Amino acid sequence: MAKAAAPRIRKKERKNIISGVAHVLSTFNNTMITISDAQGNAIAWSSAGAQGFKGSRKSTPYAAQVAAEDAGRKAREHGMETLEIEVSGPGSGRESALRALQAVGFSITSIRDMTPVPHNGCRPRKRRRV
């Protein structure tokens, strides 16, 4: 029986991009951070689930902070220094993700809230009664 060839893994090259955009999507269940260049090509990404948080711990501000630090560290390896931040979603990890990106060492030029607001579109889900 012939031996299967091992898949070749290419080493990621350093991209040398100075400025970019951090897209922070904070839902009720998770927080996802994607750092892209000005054209929208993803450079680095991370999420609370990818950092090992499971279940309701994914929606905590601390999980968002850990995910933002990880994505920021990956983007710094590509030479990124300045960020514009686009925040969307109603979750609890919005502010802590911003603070974590600032703590990594990025200079933040602008913060935009891109949360979609309906002009009376779809019917919302039923209200929670606790």
UniProtKB/Swiss-Prot annotation:
CC terms in the record's Gene Ontology section: ribonucleoprotein complex; ribosome
GO biological process terms, semicolon-separated: translation
The keyword GTP-binding is annotated on this UniProt entry: no
Pfam families in alphabetical order: Ribosomal_S11 (PF00411)
Keywords for the protein's UniProt record, in alphabetical order: Ribonucleoprotein, Ribosomal protein, RNA-binding, rRNA-binding
Keyword rRNA-binding: yes
Database matches in Gene3D superfamilies: Ribosomal protein S11
GO molecular function list: rRNA binding; structural constituent of ribosome
NCBIfam families associated with the record: PRK05309.1, uS11_bact
Function: Located on the platform of the 30S subunit, it bridges several disparate RNA helices of the 16S rRNA. Forms part of the Shine-Dalgarno cleft in the 70S ribosome.
Record-linked PANTHER family: 40S RIBOSOMAL PROTEIN S14/30S RIBOSOMAL PROTEIN S11
Oligomeric form and interacting partners: Part of the 30S ribosomal subunit. Interacts with proteins S7 and S18. Binds to IF-3.
Membership in a protein family: Belongs to the universal ribosomal protein uS11 family.
Protein name, per record: Small ribosomal subunit protein uS11
Species, as recorded: Gluconacetobacter diazotrophicus (strain ATCC 49037 / DSM 5601 / CCUG 37298 / CIP 103539 / LMG 7603 / PAl5)
